[in-house]
Regions:
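Amphipathic, small/basic residue-rich leader segments at the start of a protein or domain
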Residues: 1-100, 121-128, 256, 351-358, ...
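C-terminal helix-coil-helix/basic helical segment that borders enzyme active sites and/or dimer interfaces
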Residues: 30-39, 279, 284-291, 302-358
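N-terminal glycine-rich flavin-associated loop
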Residues: 98-117, 143
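A short, Trp-centered hydrophobic/proline-enriched beta-strand micro-motif
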Residues: 129-137, 181
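A short core secondary-structure module
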Residues: 158-159, 163-209
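Glycine-rich beta->alpha junctions and the first turn(s) of the following alpha-helix
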Residues: 206-304, 376, 392
Length: 400
């Protein structure tokens, strides 16, 4: 594994840094919680929303809005290492990149399995930001065991009629399109008989109900389908082969360098809090073990980065990082929780005060981070699922 950039990679890294120096307002670097997140009202702050309207076209001009996409589809056509460098440099500046379900999941899956008509219809609107996408996979009783889903899609002439329910759908309340898996052959084994659809979220019969979390944030939703008609032309791939498409989609979700950098930035923030704030200094002086705890988190964040480097190295050799991706996901999720606990220890009683209270620590970020971290071992595949993958595929242990 080579840690140093080649001359070509160093030139690209310098290009990215120069772009950020010129185009990215440094005042936004201190507001990382806004990137990709919506407030309780479901709207971005006005100044940030205005910035993104001018920022996204600048990225698309360079192909950086979708760096992994081929150039013929409006992407950057970057190598795996160049994508890694771009993600790393943007993460250190806390600079936003277009992303989400459309860029990361729907688009790549359409490129692999879509017809030419589907590619021409949907891919340009993902790149331009005209279409925002959501993922309609999980159901009550079909989360980790996704193949147990019960939502039905029945062929009726030139349409499929969909009935059922999805849950934990991020961003459904502002999505234009969704990737939907539904059962089209209830008599087939559960991993078969599932089909994959590209769904217009404005179709009559779709009801989106908010799920407000303990942070008073509206990110997740329940989505109900009542006789929703989906054109057969929006079936992606073959009927009853949707499970294999869904597996491809989920393969695009990986723990990358951006998460490691985010954790290293949190360590920097905590170190600054310990050195400069009255509360942080007092707690560290009373409890020297906090120094050790913070040092452990700093080391673990560095290790997380090395795991990401290993995955990139494997991809450059044409290898599939199967168990390694699970190792990265497990390590990152568990570190998220440990970092949040360390932050709470560091702020002491002040860690319980939220938002803009005068007595809150760092604007109330500590309790929000702590509560949000509890979702990390669940989203994107639970820690238990990752351990099973590591055991069976990595250690060749028998299934329980």
């Amino acid at each position: 594994m080579e840690f140093r950039d080649s001359p070509k990679e160093a030139e690209f890294r310098a290009e990215v840094r120069s772009f950020l120096d010129k185009e990215f307002p440094p005042e936004f670097s201190n507001r990382p919680t806004e990137w990709g997140l919506f407030n309780a009202a479901g709207r971005m702050s006005g100044d940030f929303a205005g910035f993104m309207r001018s920022w996204t076209p600048k990225l698309n001009e360079r192909g950086w809005g979708a760096p992994a996409w081929p150039k013929e589809h409006g992407g950057g056509g970057l190598s795996v290492t160049e994508q890694f460098i771009l993600s790393e440099e943007f993460a250190w500046r806390r600079a936003p990149r277009p992303g989400g379900i459309g860029h990361g999941w729907a688009g790549p899956t359409i490129m692999v399995y879509g017809t030419e008509e589907q590619k021409q219809e949907f891919l340009p609107k993902i790149i331009s930001g005209e279409h925002h996408w959501c993922q309609l996979f999980s159901e009550p009783g079909a989360g980790s065991d996704l193949a147990s889903l019960q939502t039905r899609a029945v062929r009726d002439g030139d349409d499929y009629v969909v009935n059922g329910q999805k849950i934990w759908t991020s961003g459904a309340h502002h999505a234009d399109m969704g990737i939907l898996i539904a059962r089209t052959d209830p008599g087939a084994p559960k991993h078969r008989g599932i089909s994959y659809f590209l769904l217009n979220m404005k179709t009559p019969g779709i009801t989106v109900r908010p799920l407000v979390n303990m942070l008073s944030s509206h990110e997740f939703n329940e989505v109900y389908f009542e006789d929703v008609r989906v054109p057969a032309s929006n079936l992606l791939g073959e009927e009853n082969r949707g499970w294999y498409l869904a597996a491809t989609t989920l393969d695009f979700e990986r723990s990358g360098i951006a998460t490691s950098v985010a954790h290293q930035l949190i360590v920097q923030d905590l170190r600054q809090f310990a050195n400069e704030s009255r509360v942080g200094r007092a707690n560290v002086q009373r409890n020297p073990a906090l120094r050790v705890e913070l040092a452990e988190r700093a080391i673990e964040a560095q290790v997380e980065g090395l795991i990401s480097y290993r995955i990139i190295s494997m991809q450059n050799r044409g290898e599939i990082p199967n168990k390694e991706s699970s190792i990265a996901k497990l390590y990152s999720s568990e570190l998220d929780v440990r970092l949040a606990v360390t932050a709470m220890h560091l702020a002491g009683l002040h860690s319980q005060i939220v938002d803009r209270d005068d007595e809150s620590a760092m604007g109330g970020r500590f309790p929000r981070f702590y509560m949000h971290s509890t979702t990390s071992p669940i989203g994107g595949g639970t820690s238990e699922i990752q351990r099973n993958i590591i055991a069976t595929r990595g250690l060749a242990l028998p299934r329980a």
